[in-house]
Amino acid sequence: MENNIVNLEVEYFKRKNQEAYQTLMNKEFEKVNELLQEPLDKIEKSVKGETYCPQNIFEAGIFLNFLDKKVEQKDFAKVNYYDFYLMSAAANYNLNLLEKSREDYIKAIEFNPASSIARLQVLEIDKRQKNYATYLEDVKEFFKYAYRRSDIAKAYRDVGYYLYEVKDYEMALVAYYLSNVYEFTETAINEIKHIGETEKIDLDSKAWLSEKMMGEFHNKYKIPLLPSEKLTSLAIAMANDAESKKAFPVARFAYQVAYELTLEEGYLKKIEEMKNM
């Protein structure tokens, strides 16, 4: 739980957050680290136990429903500690201090396990350093919390990159194809073409898109082909509950998540119906 955090401290952290954010936007990365040193020291000394910093109502729902914590341990932070580690990680990444950046992203994940930003950046750093020891495990952990289509697409591209590196070319094609299912990008298309040309794979045959290949991809690497059913059920339940209570902003947000995970047009209609509520 949070210890020794009083209202004055909350204001202090808000001020430091704003200062560091503006400095980060100005790309003064060394100065960002200077500004963050004191608040990060305070966080290390003051925050004990399990504390969580959801960035939206759906992430709060993930925390309350799925994270493996005893009820009495659950605590929402008064201060967005997650942000401080995210900014430190970004500054260190831009200074090419990749190990420190990775450590900061891991710390950010501790405060917000549902952070796609931090999880995808850990994968990016591991790609740059060719550190693949826990790569697939980290990808699988990402998919437990992924609820944005663009993030899911990026994760599949990361898997495609990894599989190309380990010379599993046909499975890399499957990963890049799945990426485009969630968000079409020229990056994925170009990688597919590159693999086809360099490895002499007949892309026109579509054999690499077969149900058999999809099954092999899933069975071999245990990477899901679909978004988390738990998250989908949570989004729908949250949306229905919020709508019944006339909490329309929450309902719209949850229906948007449900749409991203399912592409069910009915959820878009729901959002439109509640647009002015």
Residue ranges and their predicted role:
Residues 84, 118, 152-155, 188-189, ...:
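TPR alpha-solenoid repeat register
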Residues 4-6, 42-81, 143-152, 223-225:
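Flexible helix-coil transition and linker loops at the boundaries of alpha-helical arrays
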Residues 29-30, 98, 132, 169-170, ...:
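TPR-repeat structural position
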Residues 21, 90, 124, 161-162, ...:
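Residue-level recognition of tetratricopeptide repeat
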Residues 59-76, 129-138, 161-171, 196-219, ...:
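Alpha-helical linker/edge segments of TPR/alpha-solenoid repeat scaffolds
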Residues 44, 113, 147-150, 183-184, ...:
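Short coil turns that delineate tetratricopeptide repeat
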